[in-house]
Design a protein with these regions (language model features):
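Conserved, mostly hydrophobic/aromatic
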Residues: 8, 39, 47, 79, ...
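Catalytic domains of carbohydrate-active enzymes, especially glycoside hydrolases
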Residues: 35-50, 95
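Short, acidic/polar
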Residues: 28-40, 84-90, 142-149
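Alpha-helix-loop-beta-strand connector modules within alpha/beta enzyme cores
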Residues: 5, 56-80, 111-129
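Glycine-rich, proline-tolerant flexible connector loops at the mouths of alpha/beta enzymes
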Residues: 46-64, 104
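Conserved anion-binding
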Residues: 12-15, 19-23, 93, 97-149
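Glycine-rich beta-strand-to-loop/alpha-helix junction loops that act as flexible
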Residues: 52, 78-83, 102-104
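Extreme N-terminal starter segment of soluble prokaryotic enzymes
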Residues: 1-3
C-alpha cells in the first residue's frame, strides 16, 4: 500500500477545509514547503497536493510553491485542484509532478479527458467524489447524473 499524506494550499498556507467548505477552514502555521519537508523527514515517499486557490479559479495559482516542493524533496508528487485545461496539465508536468489529478472537469467534459489522456497518458489520475451513489462535482456542490458504479 502507498500512503500519500496531503497538503491543501490556500492563500499560500496549509489549510484543512471542513467538508469542502472554503468558509470553514483551519489554517496551519507551517508553510507548504515546511510541511513537505516534515513528511519527507518522517519517511514518506509520496505527497498529495491540492491547490485550493486553483480549484476556485481554474488557474495554477500555487504552481511556484508546488514546483519548489518538487525540486527540494525526493517525493512522488500528485497535484490536483481546478485543473481544467491542457495548459495547466503541461505546467504541472513541467514542474515535475508525477501525477496530475483531474476531477470535475473530467466528469463534465469527456473530450477534455480524452485529450488529456492521449497527451499525458502516464501522468493523469482521476479524483472522483461520490455522494448518494452519484459522482459529485464542483467541490461537492453538485451531483452529476452519473452513478458511481
Amino acid at each position: 500500500m502507498k500512503i500519500f499524506p496531503a497538503i491543501d494550499i490556500k492563500d499560500k498556507k496549509c489549510v484543512r477545509l471542513v467538508k469542502g467548505d472554503f468558509d470553514n477552514k483551519t489554517e496551519y502555521e507551517m508553510s507548504p514547503v515546511e510541511q513537505a519537508s516534515k513528511y519527507k523527514d518522517h519517511g514518506f515517499k509520496n505527497l498529495h497536493i491540492v491547490d485550493l486557490d486553483g480549484a476556485l479559479t481554474g488557474e495554477t495559482v500555487n504552481l511556484d510553491i508546488i514546483k519548489d516542493i518538487v525540486c527540494k524533496f525526493d517525493l512522488k508528487v500528485e497535484v490536483g485542484g481546478g485543473i481544467r485545461n491542457l495548459e495547466s496539465i503541461q505546467k504541472y508536468s513541467d514542474a515535475g509532478a508525477d501525477k496530475i489529478i483531474l476531477g470535475s472537469a473530467a466528469i463534465k467534459d469527456k473530450k477534455f479527458l480524452k485529450k488529456a489522456c492521449e497527451k499525458f497518458l502516464n501522468k493523469i489520475a482521476l479524483g472522483l467524489d461520490a455522494k448518494n451513489g452519484y459522482l459529485s462535482v464542483s467541490g461537492w456542490k453538485e451531483n452529476s447524473n452519473q452513478l458511481t458504479l
